[in-house]
Amino acid sequence: MTILPRHKDVAKSRLKMSNPWHLLAVGFGSGLSPIVPGTMGSLAAIPFWYLMTFLPWQLYSLVVMLGICIGVYLCHQTAKDMGVHDHGSIVWDEFIGMWITLMALPTNDWQWVAAGFVIFRILDMWKPWPIRWFDRNVHGGMGIMIDDIVAGVISAGILYFIGHHWPLGILS
């Protein structure tokens, strides 16, 4: 379904930043960017990821799993409140996708973070198979989340491969 710009403005006007579900769904406002909101949401996820790197990996994983569970609800509810499924302003799914992607970094150097960001954004925007299948066939809050989860898992796999099996020094 194509949404005319005027209708997107109407949908955004239905957001209430005092509603914690809406605030999280739009990535603390990063998804309200008039240009490339998904990219802005992915960038906004990085400082939160950095704070999460101080957690033991088990707790980091638990935070991501809780983020997925909460995200299914908050994305569904926010989309319902806005009257648009998977509105571009809803970027919590990008947060989760980035956190999954960045779990696979061999080191926390900024070059690896940038590589993870670029790989995730390319996959999230391009939506190759199987990402596209999930995007088209799963609906509701899970439908909003799942394509970014799959893009994050694939991005993490690519980063892991590059970091552990590619000739040394490529990104160092």
Swiss-Prot record:
The chain crosses the membrane at residues 32-52, 54-74, 142-162. GO terms for molecular function: lipid phosphatase activity; metal ion binding; phosphatidylglycerophosphatase activity. It is a multi-pass membrane protein. Its main location: membrane. Disruption phenotype: Displays 7-10 fold higher levels of phosphatidylglycerophosphate (PGP) than wild-type. Simultaneous deletion of pgpA and pgpB leads to 40 times higher PGP levels compared to wild-type, while simultaneous deletion of pgpA and pgpC leads to almost 100 times higher PGP levels. Lethal when combined with the deletion of both pgpB and pgpC. Pfam families: PgpA. It is found in: Cell inner membrane. GO terms for cellular component: plasma membrane. One of its GO terms (biological process) is response to magnesium ion. Pathway: Phospholipid metabolism; phosphatidylglycerol biosynthesis; phosphatidylglycerol from CDP-diacylglycerol: step 2/2. SUPFAM superfamilies: YutG-like. Keywords: Cell inner membrane, Cell membrane, Hydrolase, Lipid degradation, Lipid metabolism, Magnesium, Membrane, Metal-binding, Phospholipid degradation, Phospholipid metabolism, Transmembrane, Transmembrane helix. InterPro entries: PgpA (IPR026037), PgpA-like_sf (IPR036681), YutG/PgpA (IPR007686). It is an enzyme of class 3 (hydrolase). Its cofactor is Mg(2+). It catalyses: a 1,2-diacyl-sn-glycero-3-phospho-(1'-sn-glycero-3'-phosphate) + H2O = a 1,2-diacyl-sn-glycero-3-phospho-(1'-sn-glycerol) + phosphate. Its EC number is 3.1.3.27. Residues 1-31, 75-141 are cytoplasmic. Residues 53, 163-172 are periplasmic. It comes from the Bacteria. PANTHER family: PHOSPHATIDYLGLYCEROPHOSPHATASE A. Lipid phosphatase which dephosphorylates phosphatidylglycerophosphate (PGP) to phosphatidylglycerol (PG). This is Phosphatidylglycerophosphatase A. It comes from Escherichia coli (strain K12).
